[in-house]
Structures are given as C-alpha cells and as structure tokens.
C-alpha cells in the first residue's frame, strides 16, 4: 500500500517593524543578533561564521560582513527601525553600526551596555611576555 504524501505547511514569518540589534564585540570575535522588542531572536551572525578565521576574525571588516549577513537574514521580517545595543571593547563596534545603517535600517538609538564591575571579581594577573 502506498504512503499518503506528507503535506508540509509553509512557515509564515511574523512581521516586525521595530527590532533590537545586540552587538557583542570582544577582542577575538563579533556576534550580531537581531531580536524583536521582546527579545526573541530573529537572526544572528558572527565574524567567525562569516568565513574569517584566526586573527582576521577580530577585524572591523569581519564585523561589518557579519552585520551585513545578519541584516540579510532578517529582511524577510520587515524590520524598518533598529535599536542598537553594543557590548564589549572589541574592534567591531563602530563598523557594525555603520553596516546596519547601510543595510537600510533606520537606527533609532545606540546604547552601550558593556558590563562594568563595581569592584567585583579580582582581575587576572598581568601578562609577562
């Protein structure tokens, strides 16, 4: 007896007008995640996942490419306005914001959410090379 064909429903993408771009810029890599206002991730990209390995991963150009790839991933949601939250001291902070602006998003505000300790944990000892 023949199996009945399995019907798959086409996933309908919800339309989101405003989004939040979370940029985590470390010294070694840059991670860009675009979420809706509630924090549900819509798309993400990293400099390492964009084809950059080793020391090239920690360049501003790699962060720019990661931001462009993330922007392409969330275009189908219809996002027009972005709020950017930048975390970390890495070299990809500025270039990520420029790339998101060039991708056609209107950036409403930029917030620095880098965690700063109020004299918390003891930092690691200094390197002696």
Swiss-Prot record:
Protein keywords: Ribonucleoprotein, Ribosomal protein, RNA-binding, rRNA-binding
GO terms of biological process kind: translation
Pfam families hit by this protein: Ribosomal_S11
Claim: Ribosomal protein is one of the keywords in the record: yes
GO CC terms in record: ribonucleoprotein complex; ribosome
Gene Ontology MF term list: rRNA binding; structural constituent of ribosome
Family indicated by similarity: Belongs to the universal ribosomal protein uS11 family.
Role, per record: Located on the platform of the 30S subunit, it bridges several disparate RNA helices of the 16S rRNA. Forms part of the Shine-Dalgarno cleft in the 70S ribosome.
Oligomeric and partner information: Part of the 30S ribosomal subunit. Interacts with proteins S7 and S18. Binds to IF-3.
UniProt name for this protein: Small ribosomal subunit protein uS11
Organism of derivation: Serratia proteamaculans (strain 568)
Gene that this sequence comes from: rpsK
């Amino acid at each position: 007896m023949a199996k009945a064909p399995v019907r798959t429903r086409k996933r309908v993408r919800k339309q989101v007008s405003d989004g939040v771009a979370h940029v985590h810029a470390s010294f070694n890599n840059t991670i860009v995640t675009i979420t809706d206002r509630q924090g549900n991730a819509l798309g993400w990209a990293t400099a390492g996942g964009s084809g950059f390995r080793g020391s090239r991963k920690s360049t501003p150009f790699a962060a720019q490419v990661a931001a462009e790839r993330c922007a392409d991933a969330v275009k189908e949601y219809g996002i027009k306005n972005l709020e950017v939250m930048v975390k970390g001291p890495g070299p990809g902070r500025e270039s990520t914001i420029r790339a998101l602006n060039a991708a056609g998003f209107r950036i409403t505000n930029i917030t620095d959410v880098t965690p700063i300790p109020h004299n918390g944990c003891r930092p690691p000892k200094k390197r002696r090379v």
